[in-house]
Swiss-Prot record:
Pfam families: OprB (PF04966)
Membrane disposition: Multi-pass membrane protein
Localization terms from the record: Cell outer membrane
Similarity comment text for this entry: Belongs to the OprB family.
Superkingdom to which the source organism belongs: Bacteria
Chief location bin: membrane
GO BP: amino acid transport; carbohydrate transport; monoatomic ion transport
Name of the protein in question: Porin AaxA
Entry GO CC: cell outer membrane; pore complex
Sequence intervals crossing the membrane: none
Miscellaneous note of the record: Functions optimally at a neutral or moderately acidic pH.
Role noted for this protein: Facilitates L-arginine uptake, as part of the AaxABC system. The arginine uptake by the bacterium in the macrophage may be a virulence factor against the host innate immune response.
A GO MF term: porin activity
């Protein structure tokens, strides 16, 4: 587990070293979960903003000096002003994302149990993300450190017990139990010309396997089959490296490997790389820009090894397609599958539609409806006498924005033919997600 001492040390290092660079030049359209959060907060780069009238000093402690020189308290004390000052002084982009998600599930008594579970199930979510540009020059290229951490806590009933009561093979949210994972801590070097990037460190394929609204419980759909690749067996965060080829702004190709042991991403361990078991993957993304709007089409192929934490060797794949069919309509789909017996789902078919700011009221407003059918992996589920081969979920949500930082999202999930409750035709989950983004 990453300790607060480690996080504090990382923060002090970020403030203690001066960097003389511009903000990252991201190719647009290629979805990345953590960079998407930062880009949402920073729709325009610092480079494009008006120059500061505050003099900046260049020394070992210049970032600290520049923070005080920018007078973040002059318009009143606020976390937002302080973060903005830190970002400008250290050449970073920071996103702090908080979420509280109560979910009411029916039935709330597991099959064969006499006592009902407590409802709602309360999930607390916190995820800080940072992009720190160390340098950016025509001769040296661009060097960036990316960091993202996820903390999940439950009160009353956790997601595992709630799923068991509802009888679903897939989860009712993205994180079904208490966990802490280091999703990303990488250094990436983009060489002059922007064609080739080498990244080393800890990262997860969950960040790239998906599109704008079917890859992140925090900002889109909540049910696992609609917020993730439901058959994925890759790590939540593991050490390794990848090469990225970017021949133009519309095409991106990655080839990489990771150690096979750190399935849950709970620590940062280079030692695992000496154990000679590695996961490999290849990924390609295309982001055309037709007249109707931006789109993204991607394919991911991966293999994971058999290790004590995951008792099956797996070959998996994922096909994603998303397209703005109108200025405010975003259509997406996904087909994914995996071999082996690592997870209770070995194939999913997903289709959904999201309307962005449908009433021209607030930029965070969303209306979404999605449908997923999951093929159940019977060999991965034990202690169940009767089991359905397929399970489907229909989900609808509405995100309502309040000011620049807060949003509320009522959410409804209808599970049709829940796999672990063959005596029931449906199970239901109601949720209300409250987000705070700084």
């Amino acid at each position: 587990m990453i300790s607060f001492r480690f996080l504090l040390l990382s923060g002090l290092c970020a403030l203690g070293i001066s960097s003389y660079a511009e903000t990252p030049k991201e190719t647009t359209g290629h979805y990345h979960r953590y960079k998407a959060r930062i880009q949402k907060k920073h729709p325009e780069s610092i480079k494009e903003s008006a120059p500061s009238e505050t003099p900046h000093h260049n020394s070992l402690l210049s970032p600290v000096t520049n923070i005080f020189c920018s007078h973040p308290w002059k318009d009143g004390i606020s976390v937002s002003n302080l973060l903005t000052s830190v970002e400008k002084a250290t050449n970073t982009q920071i996103s702090l994302d908080f979420s509280i998600l109560p979910q009411w599930f029916y039935p709330h008594k597991a099959l064969g149990q006499t006592q009902a579970l407590e409802i709602p199930s309360w999930q607390f979510y916190f995820s800080p993300s940072t992009t720190w540009t160390l340098y950016d020059s025509p001769t040296a290229g661009q060097g960036i450190v990316d960091f993202s951490y996820t903390l999940i806590h439950y009160w009353q009933t956790n997601g595992v017990d709630a799923n068991q009561a509802a009888g679903t093979a897939s989860s009712m949210n993205d994180y079904s139990n208490r966990e802490n994972n280091l999703a990303q801590l990488t250094f990436s070097q983009t060489f002059p010309g922007d064609f080739l990037t080498l990244a080393i460190g800890q990262y997860s394929l969950y960040a790239i396997d998906g599109t704008l609204y079917d890859n992140d419980q925090y900002s889109g759909f909540i049910s696992y089959a609609l917020s993730q690749n439901a058959s994925a067996t890759y790590s939540l965060g593991s050490t390794g490296a990848y090469l990225q080829f970017t021949p133009n702004s519309e095409i991106k190709v990655q080839l990489g490997f990771q150690d096979s042991y750190n399935i849950d991403g709970t620590n940062f361990s280079i030692y695992n790389l000496t154990k000679s078991k590695y996961n490999f993957y290849g990924y390609a993304s295309w982001t055309p820009k037709p007249s109707c709007g931006d789109g993204q089409y991607s394919v991911l192929l991966y293999s994971t090894r058999k290790v004590p934490e995951q008792n099956s060797q797996v070959t998996g794949w994922s096909l994603n397609a998303a397209q703005h069919i109108h200025e405010k309509l975003y259509l997406f789909g996904r087909i994914n599958g995996a071999t082996g017996t690592a997870l209770p789902i070995n194939r999913s078919y997903v289709l959904g539609l999201v309307s962005e700011n449908p009433l021209n009221r607030h930029s965070q407003d969303l209306l979404g409806i999605g449908f997923a059918t999951n093929k159940v992996n019977a060999k991965a589920i034990s202690n169940v006498n009767k089991l359905r081969r397929y399970e489907s979920v229909m989900e609808a949500f509405a995100t309502i924005g309040f000011g620049p930082y807060i949003s509320l999202t009522p959410d409804f999930q209808l599970y049709i033919h829940p796999a672990l409750r063959p005596e029931r035709r449906t199970s239901q989950v109601y949720g209300l997600r409250a987000n705070l983004s700084l």
